């Protein structure tokens, strides 16, 4: 279940810090540093931040922003604290369907570092909604000297007038 992240702020920050200097942090932050979200109480109606909770246990964090003027969702971020828990994907997918069907958003864009284990799920979502995937080759080098691609997804939703 998605609940406002502010309710789990300290727990989310602690959980994310447990992944400092790890490959998981690299995939979340998109660089070699450690990134902590700034979980806000006042999000001005454009920043959405959620704790993903299962039976009272924090299992993930999901965030995105909406530019209401251009009807675009961007700045998506997802961190799983309970690998292989399908409820994370189910809850995030429900939120994405709400964005599409209730908010009638025109466009969603998100980015990731190639090799992220969730890439196959992002590809599936992109295919389902006839989106596009752009791969920029060897954009990022990790601590071990391995190059990773940068991946950009975009999906445009045609609205009936």
Provide a role label for each language-model segment:
Residues 111-112, 127-148:
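Conserved catalytic-core motifs of GNAT/GCN5-like acyltransferases
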Residues 26-74, 80-85:
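Acetyl-CoA-dependent GNAT
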Residues 85-102, 119-120, 124:
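Conserved acetyl-CoA-binding loop-helix of GNAT-fold acetyltransferases
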Residues 11-18, 91-98, 152:
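Alpha-helical elements of Rossmann-like donor-binding domains used by nucleotide-donor carbohydrate transfer enzymes
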Residues 1-38, 159-161:
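A short, well-structured alpha-helix characteristic of acyl/acetyltransferase catalytic modules
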Residues 121-129, 153:
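Conserved active-site tyrosine of GNAT-family acetyltransferases
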Residues 102-114:
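Conserved GNAT acetyl-CoA-binding A-motif
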Residues 47, 148-152:
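Short hydrophobic/aromatic beta-strand or adjacent loop that forms the aromatic wall/cage
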């Amino acid at each position: 279940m998605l609940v406002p992240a502010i309710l789990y702020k300290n727990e989310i920050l602690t959980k994310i810090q447990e992944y400092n200097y790890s490959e998981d942090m690299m995939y979340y932050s998109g660089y070699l540093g450690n990134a902590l979200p700034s979980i806000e109480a006042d999000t001005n109606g454009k920043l959405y931040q959620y704790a993903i909770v299962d039976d009272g246990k924090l299992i993930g964090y999901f965030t995105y922003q909406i530019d209401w003027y251009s009807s675009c969702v961007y700045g998506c971020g997802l961190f799983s604290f309970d690998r292989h828990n399908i409820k994370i994907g189910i809850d995030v997918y429900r939120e994405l369907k709400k964005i599409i069907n209730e908010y009638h958003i025109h466009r969603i864009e998100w980015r990731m570092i190639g090799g992220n284990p969730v890439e196959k799920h992002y590809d599936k979502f992109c295919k389902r909604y006839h989106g596009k995937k752009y791969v920029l080759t060897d954009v990022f080098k990790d601590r071990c000297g391995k190059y990773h691609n940068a991946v950009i997804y975009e999906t445009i939703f045609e609205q009936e007038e």
